[in-house]
Curated annotation (Swiss-Prot):
This is Thymidine phosphorylase. The enzymes which catalyze the reversible phosphorolysis of pyrimidine nucleosides are involved in the degradation of these compounds and in their utilization as carbon and energy sources, or in the rescue of pyrimidine bases for nucleotide synthesis. Belongs to the thymidine/pyrimidine-nucleoside phosphorylase family. The gene is deoA. Coiled coil: none annotated. It comes from the Bacteria.
Length: 443
């Protein structure tokens, strides 16, 4: 028998906690025998004194096991359970294509996603722009769609990882969100509760990233790779660039349009293509569907070119209550804003730098993101045709189009976009889309 205050004292004194002590504390979080004050004190002790990898693995697995852990064995699936998670960015629409692409290659993708908060968009908000799509199906429907379509993208259900829900809300209110140990456990407990065989982790770097520096992004990527593999799920982290909007747009309906256009081949943003292929190929290799990245890319390009990925996306949408002809007729179903107009820079030159976070906040100001949980979104607003770094900008070439519901909202977003996209005299050096892979063998 342990005492919560003694566990807190040990961590306060920078001692190493045993797996049993961590399990006891997490059980207390879940069943309310540990108080809010004790959880806050524990979080602060971890924030200042950190955890070693064994402690992080114990915390992650205890939180994962605090609720239901999905088990897919009874469905007799003929492929691996694979998934991707992103630390979040602006114009990060990858999940919408990656899930169907991986499923079209023989994987099964039960993707449990989140909503947007702050400057980053949320995958579920994008799906909420699709009429009828149910992001909170019951377990039976979720399993049915995973089995029949190969992919289902839904929200976190109440019985998954209850310990994280309580712990995270307290961390948010007590300034302990930024701990790498606690971030690792929060992200992975939710992902691993989906019963995954393999996971590709997208850790963003740059002005639109969650972590403020490259070094901290790399530290988080290493922690996630070590802990996930230690917890029994094959995992690789990719460090990817978020110094500019990833897709050509940012918002909800606008990103769904770009995702469908990507899958049908109508338009594929080259940066979005590179990061999507990198993550998806890694999922196929980790899941044993392909023996190396080159083979995985051949398979992925084939399911894009033959329309199978787009067909599976359509099957998922209709399976979860959306229109059966969504892929063919998405413009009929997705909302449009009252005003769609270009923004021009004040001078000619090259797009030399981008404050991606500020562009994300411009979408929030338009009504396409949340200032606080529970805010109601306008799915029609956002940015589209956003220029890329290195593009030549002049009086004929806008830096973006703004989708707004009023002149006032347009003017506010226009000022924010002009401030966030810097125009210089010289073309900047090209930055890579993927900085590096961190595999288990790299640790």
């Amino acid at each position: 028998m342990f005492l919560a205050q003694e566990i807190i004292r040990k961590k306060r004194n920078a001692e190493v906690l045993s797996t049993e002590e961590i399990q006891f504390f997490v059980n207390g979080i879940t069943n309310n025998t540990v108080s809010e004050g004790q959880i806050a004190a524990f979080g602060m002790a971890v924030y200042f004194n950190d955890m070693n990898m064994d402690e992080r693995i114990a915390l992650t697995t205890a939180m994962r096991d605090s609720g239901t852990v999905l088990d897919w064995k009874s469905l007799d699936l003929n492929g691996p359970i694979i998934d991707k998670h992103s630390t979040g960015g602006v114009g990060d629409v990858i999940s919408l294509m990656l899930g169907p692409m991986a499923a079209a290659c023989g994987g099964y993708v039960p993707m449990i996603s989140g909503r947007g908060l702050g400057h980053t968009g949320g995958t579920l908000d994008k799906f909420d722009a699709i009429p009828g799509y149910n992001t909170e199906p019951d377990s039976a429907l979720f399993r049915k769609v995973v089995k029949e379509a190969g992919v289902a993208i839904i929200g976190q259900t109440g019985d998954l990882v209850p310990a994280d829900k309580r712990f995270y809300s307290i961390r948010d209110n007590t300034a302990t969100v930024e701990s790498i140990s606690l971030i690792t456990a929060s992200i992975l407990s939710k992902k691993l509760a989906a019963g995954l065989d393999a996971l590709a982790m997208d850790v963003k770097v740059g002005t639109g990233a969650f972590m403020p520096t490259y070094e901290l992004s790399e530290e988080l990527a290493r922690s996630i790779t070590a802990v996930a593999n230690g917890a029994g799920t094959k995992t690789t982290a990719l460090l990817t660039d978020m110094n500019q909007v990833l897709a050509s747009c940012a918002g909800n309906a606008v990103e769904v349009k770009e995702a469908v256009d990507f899958m049908t081949g109508a338009y594929r943003n080259p940066r979005l293509y590179e990061v999507t292929m990198g993550l998806c190929a890694e999922m196929l290799v980790l899941g044993g569907i392909a023996s190396n990245e080159a083979e995985a890319r051949v398979k992925l390009n084939a399911v894009l070119d033959n329309g199978k990925a787009a067909e599976i996306f359509g099957r998922m949408v209709s399976g979860l209550g959306g229109p059966a002809d969504f892929v063919e007729n998405y413009s009929k179903y997705l909302p449009d804003s009252q005003i769609i107009r270009p923004v021009y820079a004040d001078r000619a030159g090259f797009a030399s730098a981008m404050d991606t976070r500020e562009l994300g906040l411009a979408v929030v100001t338009l009504g396409g993101g949340r200032r606080k949980p529970g805010d109601v979104l306008d799915y029609s607003v956002g940015l589209s045709k956003v220029c890329a770094l290195g593009d030549e900008i002049n009086a004929d070439k806008p830096i973006a189009f703004i989708h707004a519901q009023s002149e006032g909202a347009f003017a506010e977003a226009e000022a924010a976009v002009k401030k966030a996209i810097h125009i210089g005299d010289t073309k900047p050096d090209k930055t890579p889309e993927i900085y590096r892979y961190i595999r288990e063998s790299d640790l």
